[in-house]
Amino acid sequence: MSRIAQTFSQLSAQGRKGLIPFITAGDPYPEMTVDLMHALVKGGSNVIELGVPFSDPMADGPVIQRASERALAKKVGLRTVLEYVRAFRATDLTTPVVLMGYANPIERMGVDAFAKAASEAGVDGVLVVDYPPEECEAFAKTMRAAGIDPIFLLAPTSTEARIAQIARVASGYIYYVSLKGVTGAATIDLDAVAARIPQIRQHARLPVGVGFGIRDAATARAISGVADAVVIGSRIVQLLEEAPREQAVQYLTDFIAEIRQALDA
């Protein structure tokens, strides 16, 4: 059983919901990333999504775009991100780490070489935002062969056929994008999300995490009523962008603990 499957199995047995935070690797400071990952766990996260910086992050709003730019300016690329995971794994062998990013850096490294390097570093899942549907199957197969869960996005605009296709190739969990548009955008329509998740479950026997637009404990709590996990990205990246350097780790721990408390209430 993969680390991700094990995590969701334990959560289900405890009657709890998953908390999946996102941070951009290398932001706000490259030397802080591993400490931030540990802070996420300390606060009560179940899975970590680690963003791979990319020069044209088309699915991301201005907050995560700026984080990507800052990290790239400090020369943080895919190989550096894998080193962060390796360093994190030196003291944490249980928390799943999912790399989230775009196809270009993986294609440049080579899909097979990436699968091997990611597996050796201790990566558990990979979510590539911009792989077209027809390329998903080969990529997913390569990842699974390396012991990595291929994770895919579904959106309010996803057709029934697309949901069925993703259900066939995905493992780990499904990431449901609650809003049309980019990360960090408007507020969530809870009723629309609640209506959509049963459709996904008809096809996929995987946990469903919901992200985009979750900015506080109250929204996280509301979403957890209909989903298996909540994903929080832009709000965390913004918090780190604004935090004084020496307090960033503590700010992050406290914010995650607040969300965790709301999910467990």
UniProtKB/Swiss-Prot annotation:
HAMAP family: Trp_synth_alpha. One of its GO terms (molecular function) is tryptophan synthase activity. PANTHER family: TRYPTOPHAN SYNTHASE ALPHA CHAIN, CHLOROPLASTIC (PTHR43406:SF1), TRYPTOPHAN SYNTHASE, ALPHA CHAIN (PTHR43406). Keywords: Amino-acid biosynthesis, Aromatic amino acid biosynthesis, Lyase, Tryptophan biosynthesis. Gene3D superfamilies: Aldolase class I. The gene is trpA. It is an enzyme of class 4 (lyase). It catalyses: (1S,2R)-1-C-(indol-3-yl)glycerol 3-phosphate + L-serine = D-glyceraldehyde 3-phosphate + L-tryptophan + H2O. One of its GO terms (cellular component) is cytosol. The alpha subunit is responsible for the aldol cleavage of indoleglycerol phosphate to indole and glyceraldehyde 3-phosphate. Tetramer of two alpha and two beta chains. Its EC number is 4.2.1.20. This is Tryptophan synthase alpha chain. Belongs to the TrpA family. Disulfide bonds: none annotated. It comes from the Bacteria. It holds the Pfam family Trp_syntA. The active site is at residues 49, 60. NCBIfam families: trpA. InterPro entries: Aldolase_TIM, RibuloseP-bd_barrel, Trp_synthase_alpha_AS, Trp_synthase_suA. Pathway: Amino-acid biosynthesis; L-tryptophan biosynthesis; L-tryptophan from chorismate: step 5/5.
